């Protein structure tokens, strides 16, 4: 699903750019670029609106179908879960596809499109005084995202495990693919920035985004995998009854948000400073760096 999401996102963005470039008439090339990029932001708003309904509505339908099927099947009829004799199993399977495939795909699609489109708009505004660099700044996030798709293909082929592998081994295999693609994307970003004539400081923002994504992924893995202590502690709390499981689970869930929040804040500050060349007053370049960091973070989305 990851490759479908990023492929459709880049295809849609490219097509809309060509359409708007044909229909928008503006004598000044720099102002035309600003018009196109700001107009394309509405594309991201539409994707976000659709993702809201698909993700939230799909999640509610998924859980309702799941609980309903279990109540009828296990409690009332006494048959196993997902048994074909239970008609509610059909709704349960449909709900899994709606919530876990359509909803998640729409969510990732709008995040991916939003990062690329916002960065392009910020680039158009930051380099409005230089037509050549302005177009290159608009092109940079799209090229980084496109190279990320290609390099993600290589990472996918590195995700291999043996039969009967444990969950920890599966996670290590996935890490191998993501880490390899991330390193290659850093190298590719340096080449892209060099060819486009932009400041090498922007590469620091790309690296910041990639590292931020990796840290958030590791934190999520630590707090949700049964191979690590937090989940094991929640399971162990069941020895004293369901109340302690709920309390321990809520507490662990609250603590687990600390690392991602702190990482995102630090990542935003570093990405801003790198692109602004350590000048806090250079807001236009700093915001462009934050956008580039978001593109870098999502460049491995195909995996």
Please identify what each model-predicted range represents.
Residues 1-303:
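Hydrophobic packing and interface segments
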